[in-house]
Amino acid sequence: MLAWWMLLPTLLAMLVALVLPGFMWLRAGVRSSLVAIGAAPAFTFGLITALSVLYPALDIPWEPSTVMPVLGMSAVGGAAAWALSYFRRVNGGFALNGVPFREAIGVRVPIGGRQAAIRTATWGTIVVGFLLAAWPLMSVADPANPVQQWDPTFHQNGVHAILYGKDASPFGGLHELYGGRRVYYPTGWHAFVALFARFDSVVQTANVSSLVLMAVWVTGLAALVSVLTGSRTALLAAPIIGGMLPNMPADALTMYNQWPNSTGTALVPGVAAVAIVVGRRLAADLSDGCGARSFARRIPQGLFLLLGCLGLVGAHPSAAFSLLAFLAAPLLMVIGFFTRTSLAREGRGQLAALPWIGAGLAVVVLPLIALSSPKIQAMGRYPRRGSSWSEAFSHALLPYPPFAQTTAMAWWTLIQVLLLIAGIIVTARLHTLMRRPGVRDAADARCDLDGDEDEAAALVDNDKAAPMPAWPLVSYLILAFLTALAYAPDSALRTYLLAPWYKDGRRIMGVEDIALTVLMAVGAAAIVHLFHAAWTSSLRRILVERGLDDNVEAPRWPLQVGVGAIVVLMSSFGAIDARNSAVASVYDPTRLGKSGMASEDELAMLRRMASTTDSDALILGDPIAGAAYVETLAGRKAVFPQLSTVNADGASQKVLTQRFRDIADDPEVCEVVRNLGITHFYEEEDGSYYNIQRSNRHPGLYGVDTSRGFELVDEGGTAKLWKITACGWVTPGGGAQAFADGIRSVQPGAEEPEGPQSGDE
């Protein structure tokens, strides 16, 4: 735990860098600080994505000294825009008309004690939600240990490559991981983390980024719920429920740890909140007959939204499809409303329906065209098989990751089911079916389950609070269908629709958690509302019996605290034992799961390589046996820096992975060793990785006779590091240049690796 406290400055710096550049720009147009903070990280990732593409074209290196000033200028520009917006709103324009400036802007009225309490409670629950999400990682994992899982190894080495190459472009910035082959890969997360990492702190900084994304996630969920309902209880419940969910953030940011994909998922709620606010204002302007002016008035917020969407794509393209899957229902509903309104007019007024019909077709057709693109369909060809319809149904409505099935997990699942059912009943207005015709509570009609719509709305905006819409239920069903399809038997539809997520159910389930959180938060508010109504009724009955004034209402906060405490305690803090076990399976080298690659002693040997080998050493070893960690833990170049062997020099790669064990008898092996400058061999005993034997993938790296032609340098656990002497003198092929450009021939006059290519991981 102390090691995490030492990284607190990095955590705070990351949060400030994510929030400030975009917060004030959005705050100038949206009066809710919560929504502005929830959406600001997407704006920052949009800036980072744009800069990562622009800088290589201008030959500007990617480093803090060149990027941070731009983010700082964005924050300053946003502050100026906010100040001008506030002045114009308060003064009724920019002209002073002889009035002193201080008098023109007026004196800001301090918020009242009740509103201060509401804000404190809101941010308090966000902090609680963050702590519930982060506690397993902080209590179980050592931040200096790498995540022993397939994708995180690639991503950590990707950050390391950017530090050396000073190139964060998605169009080849990670070429070092492909042996010099330039391919497209979204680098938003890598580029951001590289701004805070040093060569020897990549692992720690990457792990801290998980905490940052957890904070972004719970804040974004609170912002999203705040714009969907005026219920204060739902707003308070959302970050707590969202922080304890097993898919996102527990699985996505610990056990599975798909950092780029998880970044995109964490950004979606905040962007969705802004999209809803902008959409409502645009719809209101159009309903008021503002016409084209409606769109002109929303240009600033629209630009922010576009940059936020760019941030989603920069983090991972699947996030854009996730946002569309979540917001497709309200988009089509609004378009349908204006289409019907236009058709109801007489004469030429009906022609106004044509643009709306076109917009509706665009919402449906354009994503289908994007799904058909070669890049996206290449992702769909990833070899991930489906399962069965029973498996599909079991994951669809309440998704769950492959965590330990503990008693606490069973209780937490049951509580989620109850909250979800309550949320569905309220969102679908099913509770109104039991009432007599004409009898309907106004607060419930607005889905203001707490009855304090004005104060709740003040947290969101000064605009009139909107009723709780039914479309989140439709979004939930859409995402549940996609999750079910991921676990369903193989089909062309599965490959086509799920390509952006590599047909991976665990990626889609994190997105489904957004809709689940909304529904469960509303369900929690409904339960509190029922208890509060019963308590108030009982209290009034007692007062009537005593002849006292019964115009009173029971306090709501004891019920909010009580129901929240029951949910947290009965679920054992969101099945924290199962979440702890999940963290340990990839972080604790003494308790590794089937994705584990390096024991505690082996990690110690890897760290000693910084002193047992020269800085220009080039290490050959099976990447899925721990050799891929030599870059981030030892600062030494690996022949295969990711768990897939996809170097540009395919011929040399094949010789090494298939025939290196014949080094004493096969002269071609030594030719490759000398040509690439391989100085050391990382030996590990054969074993299983998931359900395959490592030697089946790379047989040439096992069964090597090290009794001659090798000198033992170090050992740790079952792993050994050997210096290769079988090929005579070898010019080392590692060092800073190899990190920047990828490994290449060190022999004079040798051919350069093949030119730039594009491909998919």
Which residue stretches match the model-derived regions?
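Periplasmic/ER-lumenal interhelical loops and adjacent helix-loop junctions
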Residues: 171, 177-185, 347-434
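Membrane-interface alpha helices of multi-pass inner-membrane proteins
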Residues: 288-317
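Membrane-embedded, hydrophobic transmembrane alpha-helices
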Residues: 1-114, 447
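Active-site lumenal/periplasmic loops and adjacent helix-entry segments of GT-C-fold
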Residues: 125-266, 286-292, 584-596
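Hydrophobic, aromatic-rich transmembrane alpha-helices
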Residues: 413-473
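Extracytoplasmic
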Residues: 13-16, 569-761
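Perimembrane helix-loop-helix junctions
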Residues: 288, 323-359
